[in-house]
Amino acid sequence: RHRGLNFAEVDIHVITATDLRLERDPHRTRLLETAKRLRPRLLPLDPLVRLQGIDENNEGEVAQLLAYFRLLQRRLDLSVMLVHHTRKNAAGGVAAGQGLRGSSDIHAFGDSNLYLRRTRQRLVLSNEHRAAPASPPVYLELVATNAETTHLEVIAELHQEQRRGLQE
């Protein structure tokens, strides 16, 4: 139990298939039919790289995969959450999405994007939104006072001069 929520009572389903390739059938059809049956509000796909076999740099292949995710979103009235990684040499800063691996279509797909990165032994959470200005980045810390309530906690908001330092 955390913050009044008993996780044993939450209706969560996990896909445990050993092989899931969402760029092709029958995998696409099975996911669509499963989601129709379960009616999730949120479909987390984590990590994206393990759920497909396309060339992430090929815009055509990426566009087809993202079109399938958009179809799921619209047909089933759910939110699709993609967990994706940055390039190893990606610079931080205001446009964190520019550092994502692969085609820029992956960055453009998101209506709201959250970016978590480590800098100087701290976690920084930044965001981008399609229809609203981004809020200031924040520092997060993993708080583990006891095993039952381990959580991330906002410990500070980054001020303008600190944000400039992240971009360098």
What kind of feature is each model-predicted range?
Residues 16, 129, 156:
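Pocket-edge structural micro-motifs
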